[in-house]
Design a protein with these regions (language model features):
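Short linear sequence elements within intrinsically disordered, low-complexity coil regions
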Residues: 33, 59, 210-213, 231, ...
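Histidine-centered, transition-metal-coordinating active-site segments
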Residues: 2-13, 168-171, 183, 216-240
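Acidic/His-rich, divalent-metal-binding segments that scaffold phosphate/diphosphate chemistry
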Residues: 2-144
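Divalent metal-dependent catalytic cores for phosphoryl transfer on phosphate-bearing substrates
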Residues: 83-220
Length: 240
């Protein structure tokens, strides 16, 4: 079989111009922009429609560990800090940092493992604008009315919360539901309970969720090390 055509002794494919990282990041940001804008403009009607659409299971009954494995195929097209690294690697980055800092309590390990499970919607054809991005309350809810009494933009947080509530402690379910909440802009509508959970849970977790993201840090600890944690918390398949 004839090999690839060579010009001047070089494979012609190697002569194709390569983007610098700066150019690649600029293209990434350009592609992310419209997604972020669509999410920013998400209306009350759109949120209600998404809630109705996803009131039923999408994948049927599935083991939570399998969902975590599927995160290996999920790429957030708007996350410039991860820059194409999978959500499963992101989970491992969080866990590695917690272990290093001595903050890997059983509760924080569990929420790190499951907080982004809703991003499997990226594999179903759903518009990424309805899956990723940060959230804020929609409209002008009274100050201190409580997050549960507000309409918040819809994304993977709410999808996963609806599947996990009742299966994990209430505090952790709350954290899954609101881990993408923009702070401090969303604090105005929080009630006393929300504010307490924000200080105790959301702020510490957000530190790891955001600060550990990198396309260059690939933790050596295998995810399999945490399988027993997942199987103990979810001994049976769940509707997802």
């Amino acid at each position: 079989m004839r090999g690839p055509f060579r010009a001047g002794g070089h494979d012609r494919r190697s002569l194709a111009p390569r983007r610098t990282e700066e150019e690649a990041r600029a293209l990434f940001a350009l592609q992310a922009g419209p997604i972020l804008e669509r999410h920013r403009r998400q209306s009350l009607e759109a949120v209600m429609a998404l809630k109705a659409r996803y009131s039923r299971p999408v994948l049927g009954q599935v083991r939570v560990w399998e969902l975590i494995e599927r995160l290996g195929s999920c790429i957030d097209p708007t996350d410039e800090r991860l820059f194409g690294v999978s959500q499963q690697v992101h989970v491992r980055q969080i866990l590695a940092a917690m272990e290093e800092d001595g903050t890997a309590t059983p509760e924080m390990v569990l929420v790190a493992l499951v907080h982004d499970l809703g991003k499997v919607l990226l594999l179903t054809g759903e518009d990424p604008a309805n899956v990723v991005c940060m959230n804020t309350p929609i409209g002008q809810a009274p100050a201190g009315s409580g997050l549960a009494n507000c309409v918040v933009q819809w994304n993977h947080d709410e999808f996963a919360y609806d599947r996990l509530k009742g299966l994990i402690p209430d505090d952790l379910a709350w954290l899954v539901r609101y881990h993408s909440l923009e702070l401090p802009v969303s604090c105005r509508v929080m009630d006393a309970g929300d504010l307490e959970r924000t200080e105790r849970l959301l702020v510490p977790f957000a530190h790891y969720d955001h600060a550990t993201k990198s396309p260059y840090v690939l933790p050596s600890t295998p995810l399999e090390q945490y399988r027993d944690v997942v199987e103990e918390a979810f001994p049976h398949p769940i509707w997802f």
